[in-house]
Amino acid sequence: MSELHLLSTQQLITGLQDKQFSSLELTDHYIKRINALDSKINSFITHTSETARTQAKAADEMRVQGDKRPLLGVPMAHKDIFCTQGVLTTCGSKMLHNFISPYDATIVTNIDKAGMISLGKLNMDEFAMGSDNESSYYGAVHNPWNIGHVPGGSSGGSAAAVAAGFVPVATGSDTGGSIRQPASFCGLTGIKPTYGRVSRFGMIAYASSLDQAGSMGRSAMDCAYLLQPMIGHDPRDATSIKYDMPDYVQDLNDAAASAGDKPFAGLRIGVAKEYFSKGLDTEVEQAARAALKKYEELGATIVEVTITDPEITLATYYMLAPAEASSNLSRFDGVRFGYRCENPKDLIDLYTRSRSEGFGPEVQRRILSGTYALSAGYFDAYYIKAQKVRRLIVKDFEDAFANCDVIASPTAPTAAYKLGEDLDPATMYLGDVYTIGVNLAGLPALSQPVGLTSAGLPIGLQLIGQYWQESKLLSTAHLFQQHTDHHLQHSTIAKETV
């Protein structure tokens, strides 16, 4: 029972169904680990342990009464960007340090309906703006593989909690790589679905045309289990799209059942030289190419494709995302909710001081740059031009997919770097260089672990799919994981028993 946290989601489901352990025992096991070890990681902002124990007892009773929901009684946790009724929702910011949402985000409701048990809210970069989880008002998150290193961001708390064995799966959000990059840094699998696949209702907005919720776990199957209840059309989200509802878990099982010695026979994997250019760490490149070689050995065909120069994509993203952020975050003014400065002289002073004191440096930086891009005299030259380039980026992906089924690249140019390295903003932004194009195009993509550096830090490979092809991506990663053991490696903290 001391290693329950090392079990996969499928193993947890089987264990609960076969009465090897109860949901309460499982929940208590995770809570015990969190209480003993999270002081080293700082992955949680808010704990909901007592509520979780109550829900676990209820889940055990429902199972006895014949409830067959597969995820009934399985613990998880939410990134603190998703509104949770009656529970603190901070978005990692002083601005929302006292905000208790009056409603649940749609994905929170859906996951609750599936019977899962939330253990709390997870740390994150402030308002999802960052790539290292050092901008959180609640302190930096530490990487469970090496606590002197960053976990990635902005879903760093989610990645760290799963990698540390505090929860089997967690929700995340991805605006420019915020699920995939921390998944890479923490040795996990993490998927960003097609834009519109998962409701954004109740997810605090950063850049509305780019934000998308997704799932994180140790394996593709873990991700599939959590993603399943998250998807579906939501009339409360104008960007939610009605589309076929796949059964991800069944799709993965079917793919595995029909796979032969060459499970990837007929699969064309596109590889762009633009993803293997300057700035890519040697060990990361070696691991990515070794993974592609393994795909080839298992029957895949590697096809050379061309995509937009990542530096152009990066410039486009950092014009559009801050512009949307400056608009979205204008609602935080010290009047209706959130942080309010003390003793304002007048309304202008209230606005100015509440926002200056409530937002951290990185959020202020992006608001300022976004406001500049939207200002009179610069709107056409910057924002409109970036939107036109965005359309060309979409076209380049469409052209690439005419010759391949999925596109592969390193998830990030480096493995996790040290906490406190104090990278300048431009250098930090380059950490997203391989992931942001996916968000600009609205495509699905995942990161899967493919090895470790000589320092023992995880490396991820990104797989990009065509619209609505999450099953293709998850199945591809799942079959790869049937023939490799990268996803079975555990972090230093996960190996600790309590």
Swiss-Prot record:
<dbReference type="InterPro" id="IPR020556">
    <property type="entry name" value="Amidase_CS"/>
</dbReference>
<dbReference type="GO" id="GO:0005524">
    <property type="term" value="F:ATP binding"/>
</dbReference>
<dbReference type="InterPro" id="IPR036928">
    <property type="entry name" value="AS_sf"/>
</dbReference>
<feature type="active site" description="Charge relay system">
    <location>
        <position position="154"/>
    </location>
</feature>
<dbReference type="InterPro" id="IPR023631">
    <property type="entry name" value="Amidase_dom"/>
</dbReference>
<keyword id="KW-0436">Ligase</keyword>
<comment type="similarity">
    <text>Belongs to the amidase family. GatA subfamily.</text>
</comment>
<dbReference type="Pfam" id="PF01425">
    <property type="entry name" value="Amidase"/>
</dbReference>
<keyword id="KW-0547">Nucleotide-binding</keyword>
<feature type="active site" description="Acyl-ester intermediate">
    <location>
        <position position="178"/>
    </location>
</feature>
<keyword id="KW-0067">ATP-binding</keyword>
<dbReference type="InterPro" id="IPR004412">
    <property type="entry name" value="GatA"/>
</dbReference>
<comment type="subunit">
    <text>Heterotrimer of A, B and C subunits.</text>
</comment>
<protein>
    <recommendedName>
        <fullName>Glutamyl-tRNA(Gln) amidotransferase subunit A</fullName>
        <ecNumber>6.3.5.7</ecNumber>
    </recommendedName>
</protein>
<dbReference type="GO" id="GO:0006412">
    <property type="term" value="P:translation"/>
</dbReference>
<comment type="function">
    <text>Allows the formation of correctly charged Gln-tRNA(Gln) through the transamidation of misacylated Glu-tRNA(Gln) in organisms which lack glutaminyl-tRNA synthetase. The reaction takes place in the presence of glutamine and ATP through an activated gamma-phospho-Glu-tRNA(Gln).</text>
</comment>
<dbReference type="GO" id="GO:0050567">
    <property type="term" value="F:glutaminyl-tRNA synthase (glutamine-hydrolyzing) activity"/>
</dbReference>
<dbReference type="InterPro" id="IPR000120">
    <property type="entry name" value="Amidase"/>
</dbReference>
<feature type="active site" description="Charge relay system">
    <location>
        <position position="79"/>
    </location>
</feature>
<keyword id="KW-0648">Protein biosynthesis</keyword>
<dbReference type="GO" id="GO:0030956">
    <property type="term" value="C:glutamyl-tRNA(Gln) amidotransferase complex"/>
</dbReference>
